[in-house]
Amino acid sequence: VVRRVAVCGGSGDFLLDELAHSDVDVYVTSDLRHHRAGEFLEHDGPALIDVAHWAAEWTWLPVVEARIVDALGDRVSTRVSTHCTDPWQFRPVEPQESR
């Protein structure tokens, strides 16, 4: 049963020691180092979910934009880019004919 989830957008490796002594059941973040995450899990820390760095940060940008607009109204113009900067993009390719 998951009761409490901690989320850190971007690289959250630096919080593992703090989470080891918390009541968190699952930790969602990015860029976890292989050996560091393995050692953490060996000591019964929370379950780890390692998502793409870009995806972890991009999801909250519309929320930040809305807060800026709420605070500053028409004194500021905002726009959240839709340009994906994730270097880990995979696209299907057309099969090449055999020669």
Specify the residue positions occupied by each region the protein language model found.
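Active-site catalytic microenvironments in core metabolic enzymes, especially phosphate/sugar-handling
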Residues: 1-99
